């Protein structure tokens, strides 16, 4: 038992988890955010390689990188749904999409969806941001499980996950995450 435990500790100390955020565009330019989990010695051995791909952010021990990636995508998904809901409502009040985007991005409601996705992928109706809806659901599902495990109250993560899963049922396979706006619009 002691030998097995020592072997597991040794293996654990040689691994890192390093998921990324930033999509294809930032991968091409080497500007990804790399969320690294693992011990400092192991991370320092691969730091130079990771820095070529983007900005290394140390999340914590082994596994923290993957937890951070899931939590990041949950926050992104919640912002996405809120932004889509607000844009849809603004249009019903006669607010032009471009005015909505400009005002939100100059105010406290600004987020990645309002800055990057609304005009380029939603208002244009291209819906091709390059991140599959099923992958967003996977990450939000993991985040929801993490939140459930650590806290007794998690109403928003449950609602975000349910909304994305329902959207996936309507939109089908190979849907881009920006297509969720189509569901909300109808």
Segments the model singles out, each with a brief description of its role:
Residues 47-58, 134, 140:
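A charged, well-structured terminal subsegment
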Residues 26-47, 57, 71-79, 87-93:
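Short beta-strand and adjoining strand-loop segment in the mid-core
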Residues 8, 31-33, 114-115:
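Short low-complexity, flexible loop/linker segments enriched in glycine and/or proline
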Residues 23-26, 65:
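Conserved catalytic-site region of short-chain dehydrogenase/reductase
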Residues 1-11:
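Single conserved hydrophobic/aromatic residue that forms the stacking wall/gate
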Residues 14-18, 57-60, 156:
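General beta-strand structural signal in soluble alpha/beta enzymes
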């Amino acid at each position: 038992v002691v030998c097995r435990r020592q072997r597991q500790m040794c293996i654990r100390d040689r691994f890192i988890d390093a998921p990324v955020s930033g999509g294809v565009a930032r991968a091409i330019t080497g500007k990804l955010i790399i969320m690294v989990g693992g011990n400092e010695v192991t991370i320092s051995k691969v730091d130079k390689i990771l820095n070529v791909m983007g900005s290394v952010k140390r999340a914590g021990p082994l596994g923290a990188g993957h937890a951070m990636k899931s939590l990041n995508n949950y926050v992104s998904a919640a912002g996405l749904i809120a932004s889509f809901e607000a844009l849809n409502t603004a249009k019903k009040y006669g607010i032009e999409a471009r005015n909505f985007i400009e005002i939100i991005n100059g105010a406290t409601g600004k987020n990645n969806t309002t800055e990057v996705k609304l005009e380029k992928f939603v208002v244009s109706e291209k819906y091709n941001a390059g991140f599959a809806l099923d992958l967003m659901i996977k990450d939000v599902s993991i985040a929801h499980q993490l939140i459930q495990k650590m806290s007794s109250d998690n109403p928003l993560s449950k609602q975000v996950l349910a909304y994305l899963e329902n959207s996936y049922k309507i939109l089908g396979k190979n849907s881009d995450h920006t297509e969720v706006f189509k569901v909300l619009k109808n």
